[in-house]
Regions:
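Alpha/beta catalytic cores of nucleotide-metabolism and tRNA/nucleoside-modifying enzymes
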Residues: 13-15, 35, 57-86, 91-219
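Glycine/Thr-rich beta-alpha phosphate-binding loop at enzyme active sites
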Residues: 1-4, 16, 21-66, 115-125
Length: 219
């Protein structure tokens, strides 16, 4: 990956922006930054339809990876212009907030948009409800479509599933932006730098996590 980044930057005389990844450690971030990337995708195995960690044993919790890469970026001013993109594990607006507070400049989200009308995917009816097909890019099904099947000696690191249809993507975007704006008021932040400076991460118990959700709806 590092050599490919160097090659692209060389043949384009440094004019083509390059995003590389995915990585899970600050050390990997540094190597890509020194190769000349403009942004690094951070996160291995955290996607909702990814099974890389159970198939390979490789991966770090996405938020921990973001923190590690952010600290690596702070270690040298030469890396300050390299953006961090958190990729994986985004389910709720709070996950966006935590990613940005931990040091990410942006996120990549799949499932939350895959369920919308604006995303590609076949719509079906299952048990009286509308659903869409959601396929991992490393799934067996995608490999069969693109390459005629898995290559010998390889394994699928993703799965395919059906997810309930949500409606238009703009409603999802509005909800996530609303959550971010509200979070910034809670920590008295006027911008993303303020969000990082004013946020504090603490460990919580499973019961505290349960309390964080709207538990009043449970029967």
């Amino acid at each position: 990956m590092v050599e490919m980044v160097k090659w692209v930057k060389d043949v384009t005389h440094g004019e083509m922006p390059v995003i590389a990844g995915n990585v899970a450690t600050g050390d990997a971030f540094v190597r890509l930054a020194e190769a000349g990337v403009n942004a690094v995708r951070v996160g291995i195995g955290g996607g909702s339809i990814c099974k890389t960690r159970i198939m390979t044993g490789i991966g770090v919790p996405t938020l921990a990876s973001v923190v590690d890469c952010y600290h690596a970026r702070l270690s040298n001013t030469l890396y300050s212009n390299v953006s961090i993109i958190a990729d994986g594990g985004i389910r709720y607006p709070a996950d966006l907030v935590k990613s940005l507070a931990a040091g990410a400049d942006a996120i990549i989200a799949g499932r939350i948009f895959a369920a919308t009308l604006d995303a590609p995917g076949e719509i079906s009816m299952i048990n009286g409800g509308k659903v869409k097909v959601y396929r991992g890019m490393a799934s067996k099904e995608v490999q069969e479509d693109r390459r005629g099947g898995l290559r010998p000696g390889t394994c699928a690191e993703g799965v395919s599933t059906y997810i309930p249809l949500k409606g238009k993507a703009r409603y999802v975007i509005d909800e996530f932006c609303g959550g971010l704006r509200s979070a910034m008021t809670y920590v008295n932040a006027r911008n993303l730098s303020g969000l990082r400076e004013n946020s504090k991460f603490i460990r919580i118990t499973p019961s505290a996590l349960d309390e964080s959700h709207a538990f009043g709806t449970k029967q």
